[in-house]
Amino acid sequence: MENQKMPISSVSNLKDLNMISRPVANFPPSIWGDRFINYACEDENEQAQKERQVEELKEQVRRELATAIDKPLQQLNIIDATQRLGIAYHFENEIEESLKHIYLHTYVENTCFEGSDDLYSVALWFRLLRQDDYRVSCDVFKKFRDSEGNFKNSLMEDAKGLLELYEATHLSVNGEEMLDDALEFTKTHLELVVSHLNYPLAEQVRHALYQPQHKGLPRLEAVYFFRIYEAYDSHNEALLKLAKLDFNLLQSLHMKELSHMAKWWKSLDFATKFPFARDRLVEGYFWILGVYFEPQYSLARKIIIKVFTMISTIDDIYDAYGTLDELKLFTKAIQRWDIGSLDQLPEYMKPCYKSVLDVYNEIEEEMDNQGSLFRMHYAKEEMKKIVEGYMDEAKWCHEKYVPTFQEYMSVALVTAGYTFLTTISYLGMGEIASKEAFDWLFSRPPIIEASESVCRLMDDMRSHEFEQERGHVASGIECYMKQYGVTEEEAHDKFHKRLVKAWKDINEGCLRPYPMPKPLLMRILSLTRVIDVIYKNEDWYTHVKKPMKDKIASLLIDPMIV
């Protein structure tokens, strides 16, 4: 950590010091500059033509789904392709009805279907029904085990089946030891055979071993899957063309949204006013695309990205700049939630505090227009909670206090920010985000606790070395090592086991009967997926290296060639 000294004249209400020593994290600057500010709209006639093509192709796909009504395996393959290609949102009703029909006939009535003795077909059946939240039993895989309960050696020759079973295991819930065994079995053997496979199956296996589909971002996974799907002779040309056209139309919408946000962000001039903070509008928007990319959530994205940039800046004020006395003032101001508190703040904090109130006022006006003003209470309360958590961590850092792991997690799950972001993600979702939904969220059900855990544990595992070098508050890794007297490697192993359980809790929380409407549960799952992608190897939000840059470019710069 470096310490910089700042003239006291720029800070109000602190008169006893001539200079203030501040921790500076030296976060890398934004790599994007003004790239996304200007957006050239596509010719209206060309766009209209593409939209007509999309509608025609959608009708063709609907017909294909309908004609396969008595062919479950064919239906499953079409559904799988639409989901992997990122266009399932166009066919939600058709997919829902198809899977319901398959569930009733093949599971409830126990009717055999073509391929019901084939590992690939059974695993695909299981995965797609679990993805649609049906409580199908993993006992369907017993037929692939020998008399001693081990998976049969003959399966090792079926790479396609092993891959599908591997993908299915990531939808497991607590108590499904058979799927735990299946994960170990498939992972081990796929790693052994991948170098002997041909393209495109070899590429599919490599990708899945790195990024299981269930934990990936659907739109990002679609970009990868386009070329894989196209390489198979059996691919559906209508599906592929529809997916590429739709991808480009959505990309245009997202670029337009980002351009609007970039102009707003530049007008705030936070990069100049808060040079110590991470300037990550583009990365933040990428994060939000992982939460929802569909066109009907345009307003929701505009709301959450503005709040996201505010909380990211506030996080860095507490984490990498503010003194304890200054942070106490900011915490009190947030608790009061009153523009009159502005005069009590240090000069450099004022633009941030005012912008927070401005953003919330703008959202409040929108909620009022929708007759949903009650939502603002929850949004404000979550902001107050997370800022209180930042304050607790700042005190620990100032006192060089290393809490117990349990004490740490009681605060760190809040500062992970995922209940906060889930709350904000609901604001622009329309009538489905009822008062009951917000009350349910505030009760911290197991699925939200699990999501918070994934966020916090992955953040700590990937960023604790950088943070300790700069004098950050003790991370969960350090707290765990100190309390239990274990090595860093052992702490990582314990965290990994906690992550496995948390994902099982999330999977369980998504199963029918739904505690809340499915779109609300999907925001929790989607936010958790973002963490798995961005913190896969390291903190790519803070340190925007080539893998992260490439992911952003694939969604927001590079169109699909149709």
Curated annotation (Swiss-Prot):
GO biological process: diterpenoid biosynthetic process
Motif (DDXXD motif): 315-319
Chain residues that bind Mg(2+) 1: 315, 319
UniProt GO MF annotations: magnesium ion binding; terpene synthase activity
InterPro entries, alphabetized: Isoprenoid_synthase_dom_sf (IPR008949), Terpene_cyclase-like_1_C (IPR034741), Terpene_cyclase_plant_C1 (IPR044814), Terpene_synth_N (IPR001906), Terpene_synth_N_sf (IPR036965), Terpene_synthase-like (IPR050148), Terpene_synthase_metal-bd (IPR005630), Terpenoid_cyclase/PrenylTrfase (IPR008930)
Binding of Mg(2+) 3, residues: 467
Protein name: Probable sesquiterpene synthase
Organism of this sequence: Santalum spicatum (Australian sandalwood)
Gene: SesquiTPS
